[in-house]
Amino acid sequence: TIVIFTSDNGPVTREARKVYELNLAGETDGLRGRKDNLWEGGIRVPAIIKYGKHIPQGMVTDTPVYGLDWLPTLANMMNFKLPTDRTYDGQSLIPLLEQKTLKREKPLIFGIDMPFQDDPTDEWAIRDGDWKMIIDRENKPKYLYNLKKDRFETLNQIGKQPDIEKQLYGKFLKYKQDIDNDSLMKARGDKPTPVTWG
């Protein structure tokens, strides 16, 4: 049996703007942001996994992973062969669970498409190694941070690290092009009207 425990992203906004947000406190360990945005406080979540004797008890890692990694990881654990006629954004975490170094093949990409989020101008974030870029709804780089040196995202490096900026932005544009050219996205047509809650 494989048990995975994780949580929804980010605690609710401090204003508790909606009735169901009242008394739903949450902390981010001082990280910038909360739910509805792309700062680390809005996207970082815990994850706990138990898989009998296959994973050492008490093992802890701070290696960045994300939800899209679970599909290839679970498929790998169950010896299930994934179809090869499509691209998977995540990658198997088996090396990490075996206490080896996880070599990322692709950057981590986060998207938010909510017109009523805290900062409605931001739509994408890309993380590659220690660097993270936040991109606005016009697909323009807006923020750049070295999360190893600046985990609280206070020192915007846009314009100060042109090589890193160009590299990250190029990877984002490739990812975005792949999404825009995906047959399911093309079949869907224009984006559907966002759902609003209460």
What is the meaning of each model-derived region?
Residues 70, 119, 128, 133, ...:
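Long, internal low-complexity/basic segments
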